[in-house]
């Protein structure tokens, strides 16, 4: 391990407790790739501007590439008493190449260096999560297409409401994930600006060219204001919020999968490789994956609130409080990536029990609204009158132990003689489902349109 780089101002050795509190290497070593990438770009710019020699730049570049290779092979371990990943790599570089390594930090502060490394990490993982969202959407669309005619009770208040198809239900989650994808990509563009060159807070007197490093690192342009840049963690808050929203959507789907796989429903069966057993009850098959996804949502929400709380009262510019920005982001990113991977695999492998879903449609009088709509459209009744008549019909069905769709015409007319024979066919659950032909509705033909629209959208994303 390289010799620790000391502060020029502090004359006494740091307290061991201060070191334990202050040192971030145990967690920010995750940023080694970004730190090396940023340093190579910075050294290139310094050379282009004549601030350091080409010879020194080439030594720095080769040394950094060697360090990267040694980290990834395990030859160079990021451990020891270095304060952070930045000091660890700079110190090791200087040990390897001598004085040229000491020139690397010219016209740079750890403030803009940290901002750069962290932003590069967030940008890279924003793209990774966005790609996983697309993969999940593709799987949702596949399941939806296979089940555009599979009826199940649509619910409000977790009570049977109206008949829908399972494809339509899965398209609701595909729509959520589409918004999530667009949110991540919007954040990527908004945050794709280079912090390097801002130095501590006010820029630098060296004749640097921030556009050079920006271009080298793939950013759109340098950031506008250095004071803002070194203290900005909006990009970290955005990825935390975006992940929290994705996890919330996953948690809602997970809750439904947990319910649907229970004996009281049996609407879906999770594959054995995506379920666990019990240590004492041999008959059990537990939905641990959706339960864990639901539980992990609380953790990522906590990471968002934690960083919001850290940032809420900080004066400009950088403050050491901001070292608390990274662990929550690293944790949320890891959690989101693993969660999206396992969710997609689980959904692709689950079995949809179509008969159980359709049997459930005979409970709860799902076509009651169709009777009220019939009385309004065909008999000209005010909706509130039709609503009360339909309520009386439902009460009659309850008394007879039948679903409203099973009542005879005679039963219906005993409540109101204006109910004619043509209503009987409308009360069939499948007819009720397919009657909802408005744009975005649950009719099979509309569901298939939504599927085709989303397929076209997916193709456009693949072309980008």
Curated annotation (Swiss-Prot):
Molecular function (Gene Ontology), one example: argininosuccinate lyase activity
Enzyme Commission number(s) from the entry: 4.3.2.1
PROSITE patterns given in the database record: FUMARATE_LYASES
Localization in the cell: Cytoplasm
Catalytic activity line of the entry: 2-(N(omega)-L-arginino)succinate = fumarate + L-arginine
Keyword terms: Amino-acid biosynthesis, Arginine biosynthesis, Cytoplasm, Lyase
UniProt gene name: argH
Alphabetized InterPro entries for the sequence: Arg_succ_lyase_C (IPR029419), Argininosuccinate_lyase (IPR009049), Fumarase/histidase_N (IPR024083), Fumarate_lyase_CS (IPR020557), Fumarate_lyase_fam (IPR000362), Fumarate_lyase_N (IPR022761), L-Aspartase-like (IPR008948)
SUPFAM superfamilies referenced in this protein's UniProt entry, alphabetically: L-aspartase-like
The name this protein goes by in its record: Argininosuccinate lyase
Classification via PANTHER family: ARGININOSUCCINATE LYASE
HAMAP family membership: Arg_succ_lyase
Pathway(s) of this molecule: Amino-acid biosynthesis; L-arginine biosynthesis; L-arginine from L-ornithine and carbamoyl phosphate: step 3/3
GO biological-process terms attached to the record: arginine biosynthetic process via ornithine; L-arginine biosynthetic process
CDD domains in alphabetical order: Argininosuccinate_lyase
Family (UniProt): Belongs to the lyase 1 family. Argininosuccinate lyase subfamily.
Cellular component per GO, a single term: cytosol
Enzyme category, top tier: lyase
UniProt main location, coarse: cytoplasm
Pfam family, one: ASL_C2
